[in-house]
């Protein structure tokens, strides 16, 4: 029984549930009123990259000390005639924001602890305080028609997860946080 349970968990990690919602085309993604292009060093400048559906950014209820945000991200790959839509949710631990860690470090210094400032950076790199999950996904052709193709967990890791501090994938959840709450996650106390 345990083996069946572990096998089913492994299969879920490889597959993403179908995304509910509208298919989008490459032309739709270029509508700056509805979608925001998220700059990336991997972009070629030919319409590829990540796009945030601005109407999908929603704060969710979360346990004390956390904040949660849900949004839809589209990853455009025009050369492959493919757009992947991902419904994502990010959980933010408020005690892991950079401002909170700096304040805690300064408090420790006042109490006589001689901890170097680089420890803040190392602490943040060890745990960014942001956990992302993909709730659903869909794949489309550049013209917006549905494409029957699965989204695999290893592709998600390359595109958006995990949100590691100092990594380009850290930019997306911070942008979502700022859109939802009007302040950068790392500026929260």
What are these regions (language model features)?
Residues 1-8:
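Bacterial N-terminal signal peptides that target proteins for export
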Residues 2, 17, 22-23:
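Amphipathic/hydrophobic helical signal segments and adjacent flexible N-terminal regions
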Residues 8-16:
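Bacterial N-terminal signal peptides
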Residues 22-86, 91-189:
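N-terminal secretory-pathway/extracellular module detecting exported/lumenal segments
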């Amino acid at each position: 029984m345990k083996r069946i349970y572990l096998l089913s968990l492994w299969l879920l990690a490889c597959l993403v549930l179908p995304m509910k919602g509208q298919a989008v085309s490459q032309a739709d993604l270029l509508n700056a009123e509805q979608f925001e292009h998220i700059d990336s060093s991997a972009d070629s400048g030919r319409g590829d990259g990540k796009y945030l559906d601005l109407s999908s950014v929603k704060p969710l209820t979360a346990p004390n000390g956390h904040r949660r945000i849900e949004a839809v991200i589209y990853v455009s790959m025009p050369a492959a005639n493919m757009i992947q839509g991902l419904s994502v949710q990010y959980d933010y631990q408020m005690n892991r924001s950079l401002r909170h860690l700096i304040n805690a470090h300064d408090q420790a210094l006042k109490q006589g602890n001689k901890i170097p400032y680089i420890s803040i950076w190392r602490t943040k790199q060890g745990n960014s305080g942001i956990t992302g999950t993909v709730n659903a996904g869909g794949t489309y052709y550049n013209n917006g028609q549905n494409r029957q193709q699965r989204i695999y967990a290893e592709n998600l890791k390359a595109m958006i997860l995990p949100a590691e501090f100092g990594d380009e994938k850290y930019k997306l959840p911070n942008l979502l946080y700022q859109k939802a709450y009007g302040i950068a996650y790392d500026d929260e106390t």
